[in-house]
């Protein structure tokens, strides 16, 4: 391998599609590490500071883009509810095994040593208002209003009856 071409990866994290969340109630985050050489990398997923393995699917090996460039992708699938919690923190970490201290490197440019490169995202809050939930809310509010109106009317009739009885009793005495 040509040590002059040693290059660390550029890591990107892509958030789940709204269509997948709506149709499948699942959320797939995609991590893409590109432009690295050589292909000595390890990719891991971290959620809320802990490494996770469940729901992870990583390419079996890095794909060669050109003579001195590789790429690797990985997916993390979680429930839509878990994704919609803004307290959840997702991180894709790529450990790049670059040059060792003994390897010669020209002075004046940064030496690509072994390092961790990450991309991260936070869960996205979803207000959850759909057409169906909006209509259900309007219906519930209407029913509640009618109950309160009926209760107020019943109270008014009851108070009026008591006042009328008190007036009749006072008139007769």
Curated annotation (Swiss-Prot):
Cellular component per GO, a single term: alpha-beta T cell receptor complex
Superkingdom, taxonomy of origin: Eukaryota
Note: Clone B10.A was isolated from a cytotoxic T lymphocyte.
CDD domains, A to Z: IgC1_TCR_beta
Glycosylation sites: 67, 116
Topological domains annotated Cytoplasmic: 169-173
Bilayer-spanning residue ranges: 147-168
Region (C region) location: 1-146
Residue pairs linked by disulfide bridges in the UniProt entry: none
Alphabetical list of InterPro entries matching this protein: Ig-like_dom, Ig-like_dom_sf, Ig-like_fold, Ig_C1-set, Immune_Resp_Modulators
Keywords: Glycoprotein, Immunoglobulin domain, Membrane, Receptor, Transmembrane, Transmembrane helix
The keyword 4Fe-4S appears for this protein: no
SMART domains: IGc1
UniProt-listed Pfam families: C1-set
Protein name: T-cell receptor beta-2 chain C region
Subcellular location: Membrane
Transmembrane listed as a keyword: yes
Species assigned in the record: Mus musculus (Mouse)
Membrane topology: Single-pass membrane protein
């Amino acid at each position: 391998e040509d040590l002059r071409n040693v290059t660390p990866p550029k890591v990107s994290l892509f958030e789940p599609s709204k269509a997948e969340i709506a149709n499948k109630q699942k959320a797939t985050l995609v991590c893409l590490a590109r432009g690295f050489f050589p292909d000595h990398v390890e990719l891991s997923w971290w959620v809320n500071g802990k490494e996770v393995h469940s729901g992870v699917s990583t390419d079996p090996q890095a794909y060669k883009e050109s003579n001195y460039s590789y790429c690797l992708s990985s997916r993390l699938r979680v429930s839509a509810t878990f994704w919609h919690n803004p307290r959840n923190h997702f991180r894709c970490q790529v450990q790049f095994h670059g040059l060792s201290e003994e390897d010669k490197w020209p002075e004046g440019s940064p030496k690509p040593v072994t390092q961790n490169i990450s991309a991260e995202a936070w869960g996205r809050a979803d207000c959850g208002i759909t057409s169906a939930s909006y209509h259900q809310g309007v219906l519930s509010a209407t029913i509640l209003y009618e109950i309160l109106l009926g209760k107020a009317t019943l109270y008014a009739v009851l108070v009026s009856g008591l006042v009328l009885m008190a007036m009749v009793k006072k008139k007769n005495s």
